[in-house]
Amino acid sequence: LGVLHRRLYASPAYLKHNGIPQSVEDLSHHDLITHSQHEHLNVWPTQSGTSFRANGPFCSDNAATMTSMAIAGLGIARMPSLVADPLVAQGKLQSVLIDQIEDTPNTVSAFMLSGRHRLPKIRACIDHWAQWLQTTTPTC
């Protein structure tokens, strides 16, 4: 259907209070918002080919909750740019370390069973997601 990009984001208020990290090493001095269900999403690949293991006081298994925590100024989160970039445009979030944390694209796929059980509503949903993912391009 398309590609999902993940980047680091934090609220302007959080960054004003805690400072903007200048390097991957600086992240160890920041509050990080991590995934509680998918541990592989807490390993943040770097541009230099290494990775940073994110640990933090806040975690969730839900992108909407992680987004709300980041907007509320609780820390830095690695989130889908599809969700966060519109919030950057609104001034609610800022990108962090875009030149140091790898923007690893993740392919988004959908599968349907063949045959008579294909519902038009399912097809319409998949078509909508495909259009949404393909019209959303990285801004960084």
Language-model regions: role of each:
Residues 1-108, 135-140:
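C-terminal regulatory
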Residues 114, 133-136:
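A general structural signal marking secondary-structure boundaries and capping sites
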Residues 80, 117-131:
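Short amphipathic alpha-helical coupling segments at ligand-binding clamshell hinges
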Residues 107-117:
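A bilobed periplasmic-binding-protein/Venus flytrap-type ligand-binding module shared by bacterial periplasmic
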